[in-house]
Amino acid sequence: NSSAPVSSPSRCGLTTGKFPIEVGINTFLNNKASNKKCEQRNFLSDKNPSMARAFQSAGYATGHIGKWHMGGGRDVHNAPSIKNYGFDEYISTYESPDPEPAITATNWIWSAKDSVKRWRRTEYFVNKSIDFVKRHKDQPFFLNLWPDDMHTPWVPEFKQKDNKSWNTEEAFIPVLAEMDKQIGRFIKALDELGLSENTIVIFTSDNGPAPSFQSARAAYLRGTKNSLYEGGIRMTLLIKYP
């Protein structure tokens, strides 16, 4: 089970090992006014424990590539650097203290003006992840690869101009297929680099699916994202190990 049924607090729980309420994050991080209304902090304090920092202290190279959403973005400009949480290097999205310019051409989660288009974002993250692994293959490493393409809007390449369909099952399926392809490419790279027999890969999610498709995406469990029923907090968990 995840520690919360929505993104930001769940990610904080995974990062720190604490209950989200302990770190002052109880729903998705938004602008300052919304955060205040929800009685939560504007960002995860870097004074909290961090899984990456523990690995870093043990001599691991550490990297974060993908969505952050634990502080930064919108009108929150004082969130700590991702490096403060124990990451040697990072690439992140709009909802972070230092978003990657290639995927944040405007002041929003994504834009048609981004040089890396929405439908190429996971490919971009995997390219950067493979590069990270290649550079650190001769030492222990810890990598967060947190793609965000399964979060709405789902923008497959063939539907890029049809914004009326970005929340439909028709759009969801090819986006899911593309993510599956890219994760497979990353696993293959580990094989080709001779790292599969010395690397643990954990595949999971931050929360249940958005309420859609007659709840079928939650495997017919009661509840979905934003719900404390099983459909909101019971996650896929796959672990590949030597």
PLM ranges: what are they?
Residues 1-242:
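Formylglycine-dependent sulfatase
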